[in-house]
Amino acid sequence: MYSIKCDDNKAMPRERLMRLGAESLSNQELLAILLRTGNKEKHVLELSSYLLSHLDSLADFKKMSLQELQHLAGIGKVKAIEIKAMIELVSRILATDKTLTDSVLTSVQVAEKMMAALGDKKQEHLVVLYLDNQNRIFEEKTIFIGTVRRSLAEPREILYYACKNMATSLIVIHNHPSGNIEPSSNDYCFTEKIKRSCEDLGIICLDHIIVSYKDYYSFREKSTLF
């Protein structure tokens, strides 16, 4: 369980943040600022302490759905939405800051970024990283989000943005919501198809990576397709 210490003698979190800076606040205090108010049974600091005590780590917030958040005592629809919005914004800030201007060196670096971004998604997402002639990522594009009737994407959707932005190479990534990273026969067929289509246009397909929350599969590292 997440260990929480509650100190009734502390000043209110907003005042402490103004005086000491956000980095000086505890997780309990930062969450209390987001919640703003408590409920009939608990002061806002007690409520934030209660919520954190039900988590093994802060990362559990990212994995929880709106419905799961609302089931926690004192969390209504509005507060649950605000927490999810905050978590998503932080994820996007970290993803942008970490990789958009970096040169790609290994499949591991790409996989680690995309495991954090896609590992907890309940639907299949296909994302493409487009690179320039200096191997720098200049665009990250979500090509599609899977539905019951559709799996993965057509090469033309991926290559449209490559041609539009004069990409030299690209990396394809998609997640397996089941957590099983082993490629299916459809994954192999798709990889062959997109690699061949890229070659026809003089674009290099550097890799196709499948990710889950904790692991990844790189076709470049583990298959004979590259």
Curated annotation (Swiss-Prot):
Record-level GO BP terms: proteolysis
Record-annotated MPN domain positions: 103-225
Protein name: UPF0758 protein M28_Spy0816
Chain span(s) of sequence motif JAMM motif: 174-187
Organism of derivation: Streptococcus pyogenes serotype M28 (strain MGAS6180)
Keywords: Hydrolase, Metal-binding, Metalloprotease, Protease, Zinc
SUPFAM superfamilies with a match to the protein in the record: RuvA domain 2-like (SSF47781)
Highest taxon of source: Bacteria
Family: Belongs to the UPF0758 family.
Zinc recorded as keyword: yes
Pfam family, one: RadC
Keyword Metal-binding: yes
InterPro entries from the UniProt entry: MPN, RadC_JAB, RuvA_2-like, UPF0758, UPF0758_CS, UPF0758_N
GO molecular function, one term: metal ion binding
Coiled-coil features, chain-numbered ranges: none
Amino-acid positions noted as binding Zn(2+) in the UniProt annotation, renumbered to this chain: 174, 176, 187
